[in-house]
Amino acid sequence: MAGHSKWANIKHKKAKEDAKRGKIFTKLIREITVAARLGGGDKDANPRLRAAIATALANNMSKDTIERAVVKGAGGDESANVEEVRYEGYGPGGVAIIVDCMTDNRNRTVGEVRHAFTKSGGNLGTDGSVAYMFTKRGIISFAPGVDEDALMEVALEAGAEDIITHEDGSIDVYTDPYDFSDIQEVLIEKGFNSENAEVTFDAETKAELDAETAEKVMALIDKLEDLDDVQSVYSNANFTQELIEQIG
């Protein structure tokens, strides 16, 4: 299991997301709508929808907004008929990147994604070119200061696959993606509120970068995340706290 702390990345990511709150909500609503369309509107029988709702609530989305998105998707609204597309490529320094999109026009989306890679010193790859480096899993991250022993006991009892405590005191709880929402709910019920919780593609081996390359990779990820059709971007870059502080 990878032992890299998510804490520095989370703080950096949250600062960026605060400035893009409207766009983040649009992406979350789209994920809820598509999850409901594909798997039905009952979150108890639809793990993907349950995870999408949990992420939306963690981002302070209102329950009314969430419910409207579920109804729209489950009702088969034609505007919800977008398809999911995944692109893979390499960024500066050979960093592996996965880009998950939802689109009603593949040609538009691939053109925009390719342009972002090319303008940032990377290149779009073929299907499978980097996906083998990643494992899909749930990661629930806690800030330094949480009661490690108590958290470990509750998490393992709830079915967590692994728990990693990092040098900075932060803790990551790893789950099977299908058990993610259930484990998160148990932790919340027991009083353990995470700083971040998501089903993600986690790289077993991280790419170590210097400050200049890290800044270029961050710029590429920002460009990709700003594209309307892009839902999520994953990379194997190891953005350490030291690197983030150097970049500012």
From Swiss-Prot:
Signal sequence annotation: none
Location of the protein in the cell: Cytoplasm
InterPro entries: Integrase-like_N, TACO1_YebC-like_2nd/3rd_dom, TACO1_YebC_N, Transcrip_reg_TACO1-like, Transcrip_reg_TACO1-like_dom3, YebC-like
Entry keyword set: Cytoplasm, DNA-binding, Transcription, Transcription regulation
Disulfide bonding pattern of the chain: none
UniProt record, GO biological process: regulation of DNA-templated transcription
GO CC terms, sorted: cytosol
GO MF entries: DNA binding
NCBIfam families, alphabetized: PRK00110.1, PRK12378.1, YebC/PmpR family DNA-binding transcriptional regulator
Family listed: Belongs to the TACO1 family.
Name of the protein in its database record: Probable transcriptional regulatory protein FTN_1028
